[in-house]
């Protein structure tokens, strides 16, 4: 039987029946899974970073592309690069499906607009030194465009 990830059984079923302590312990247990998953992924992350760094040293940038909450977190992370690391705001760019409106309000079906996602990359003059990181499953659709000439009209 196919179960959507968002509909799988979780620690958050029946929240109304749990004590505050149980809820807090469940949240903490889920948070610990992030560190364990990251630890397992370090070899793949290392490989990715070792490929990105040389391109960035040649002027490449990172583009985070996402939808909904994932897109918002990408924009937030990109906005923290200048004050945290003293880097220019053009080094890591967060793009969210639905544009700036989607930062505060839901923009229904924005993640399905593959043309607009690619147009935003073209507007930023994306090139072969840049890296595009999709941070939501629905972003995969816009990544089909780079297989074509770098023009959203083709």
Task: List PLM regions with ranges.
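Short, contiguous strand/loop micro-motifs
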Residues: 10, 36-39, 104, 133-135
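Short secondary-structure boundary/capping elements
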Residues: 15-19, 44, 109-116
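Glycine-rich phosphate-binding loops that contact phosphosugars or nucleotide phosphates
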Residues: 63, 67-154
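N-terminal glycine-rich phosphate/adenylate-binding segment common to multiple enzyme folds
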Residues: 51, 55-64, 73
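A short, well-structured juxtamembrane/interface segment
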Residues: 40-55
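Cofactor-/ligand-binding subdomain signature composed of acidic, glycine-rich
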Residues: 1-37
């Amino acid at each position: 039987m196919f179960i959507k990830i968002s509909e799988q059984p979780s620690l958050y079923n029946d929240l109304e029946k749990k004590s505050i302590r149980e809820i807090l312990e469940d949240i903490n247990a889920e948070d610990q899974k992030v560190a364990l998953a990251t630890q397992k992924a370090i070899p793949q992350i290392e490989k990715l970073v070792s490929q990105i760094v040389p391109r960035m040293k040649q002027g490449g940038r990172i583009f985070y592309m996402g939808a909904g909450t994932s897109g918002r977190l990408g924009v937030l992370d990109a906005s923290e690069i200048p004050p945290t690391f003293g880097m220019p705001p053009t080094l890591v760019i967060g793009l969210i499906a639905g544009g700036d409106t989607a930062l505060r309000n839901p923009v229904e079906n924005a993640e399905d607009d593959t043309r607009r996602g690619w147009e935003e990359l073209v507007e930023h003059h994306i090139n072969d030194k840049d890296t595009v990181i999709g941070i939501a499953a629905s972003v995969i659709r816009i990544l089909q465009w780079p297989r074509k000439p770098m023009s959203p009209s083709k």
